[in-house]
């Protein structure tokens, strides 16, 4: 038996700009504009850049959504 636990690979660990746009209900270009102007919403983590494209960690985005939804309910 191995002491290592393999991650769940059924979902990608990374979220593209287009996927993030669908999740937070904004257009992809709006997110690109925020990145260009360095004006990401408070709490949204900076993306990783891979081959010139921006990718967010799924865990970070889910944490942002959880935090955002808690704030709105207050």
UniProtKB/Swiss-Prot annotation:
Signal sequence extent: none
Induction, per UniProt: Expressed at low, approximately equal levels in exponential and stationary phases (at protein level).
Entry protein name: Protein YkgV
Species name: Escherichia coli (strain K12)
Gene this chain is encoded by: ykgV
């Amino acid at each position: 038996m191995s002491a290592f636990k393999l991650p769940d690979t059924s979902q990608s660990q990374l979220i593209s700009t287009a996927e993030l746009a669908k999740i937070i209900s904004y257009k992809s270009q709006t997110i690109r504009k925020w990145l260009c102007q360095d004006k990401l919403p408070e709490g949204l983590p900076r993306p990783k850049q891979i081959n010139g494209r921006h990718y967010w960690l799924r865990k970070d985005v889910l944490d942002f959504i959880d935090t955002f939804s808690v704030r709105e309910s207050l």
